[in-house]
């Protein structure tokens, strides 16, 4: 019987301690120093999306389509609002006047890793009801396709 695959339980998120303003190879991602931003609550999907452009002509019954601009993604990442060195670094990266890009890595409990690089904006501070925890939400403006390392390769 096949397994169910990895869940997000036990995973972590970390940001590079230095700016990374140029596209990175996997070996360059691996060569950076990261600090964990603890208490990740949820993260949006990552990966490249690409516009599909169309051109309608009188003589074609079906429009012509082509690939347009690609976007590295703009996922939100939400954390419990608790003090830590990682949160301090993330807040500094998100400052409105900090235009640097940073590398980040999602790591799953099975050892799989996904590396991304981009801008950090925010935070937005959630409110909610009586029994909700304080959370902060940041948006990552990713600048290149992710580099994925499967668990067997780590």
Where are these regions (language model features)?
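Viral virion structural and adsorption modules
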Residues: 1-6, 141, 145-154
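Short beta-strand and beta-hairpin "edge-sheet" elements
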Residues: 105-149
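Solvent-exposed edge beta-strands and adjacent loop segments
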Residues: 1-78, 121-132
């Amino acid at each position: 019987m096949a397994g169910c695959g990895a869940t997000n339980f036990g995973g972590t998120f970390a940001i590079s301690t230095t700016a990374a303003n140029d596209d990175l190879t996997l070996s360059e991602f691996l060569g950076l120093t990261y600090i964990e931003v603890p208490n990740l609550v949820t993260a949006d999907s990552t990966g490249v999306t690409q516009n599909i452009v169309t051109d309608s002509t009188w003589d074609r019954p079906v429009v012509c389509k082509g690939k347009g601009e690609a976007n590295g993604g703009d996922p939100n990442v939400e954390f419990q609002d608790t003090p830590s060195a990682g949160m301090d670094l993330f807040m500094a990266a998100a400052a409105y006047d900090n235009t640097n890009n940073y590398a980040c890595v999602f790591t799953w409990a099975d050892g799989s890793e996904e590396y991304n690089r981009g801008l950090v904006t925010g935070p937005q501070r959630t409110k909610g009801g009586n029994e909700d925890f304080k959370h902060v939400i940041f948006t990552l403006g990713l600048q290149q396709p992710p580099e994925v390392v499967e668990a067997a390769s780590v």
